[in-house]
Amino acid sequence: MLFLPQGLRSGVVQALVSEPPDLVALRGASPGAMFDRGIEALGGMGRFVKPGQTVVVKPNISFDLPEEMGANTNPAVVEHVIRHCMNAGARRVYVIDHAIERWESSLERSGIGAAIRASGGIHVPSNEERFYRRVSLNGATLTSTQVHEALLENDVLITVPVLKHHGGTGVTIAIKNLMGCVWDRREYHRIGLHQSIADFLHVKKPVLSVVDAHRVITRHGPRGGSPDDVVMMNSQIISPDPVAADAASAMMLNREPSDIGHIRLASEAGFGEIDLTKLNIERISL
């Protein structure tokens, strides 16, 4: 089985069509190689990033832990995303995340700092309130929040989460990853966590969601506690639809997408498709 239950496999695999798939699900190669093949299947990064544009890449860099613990996005995925953006003609590629633990150490210990430098990206600090601006948005619950200025000042957003269990929301994937773009995350908890996560898409919807499912924390997330919490899935989900990316990824953790509040609410608000049977999905084994 590649990511989806048997009943969803017929009728959604890419057939003889000229249009790129809605979602690509990959397994069996290194994280960087999977992204290279997946973005090719989607029509190339030039479909999402135009020459001269500036890009914000948002991975998970929240935890002061090494790559092997699965708490942060695999650095090879981040590096390859940035390289493809640069090759598509991006003027600059910025990387942001409001880290939960010490940001300097999290950046370097995760390997993402080295990946950014190797690929020509620019890391922008997120640890001080002066980097954020308050904006109003048309959310059901979240109507105002402080957003990282990099997100507001640049053209394209790409969310690059690592798939994980989360004790508060069930899962953390592409949509919830964007909580790392705001200053006061406690505000979400005060006014309604799942609705606020979905509402944030009114600020800026990512053009691409790249879900790293190489090492996956399946319990005690989002940080994990030991190597026993991590399962090697050696997989990746890529889609221009963040709801579809989250729906497919949630099923990898044996969760029904409609049972995850923020995924369902984002779908109901029109930000993407939660019903995978309606999508053209290409599965690639490498």
Please place each PLM-identified region on the residue numbering.
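N-terminal and secondary-structure boundary signal
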Residues: 1-286
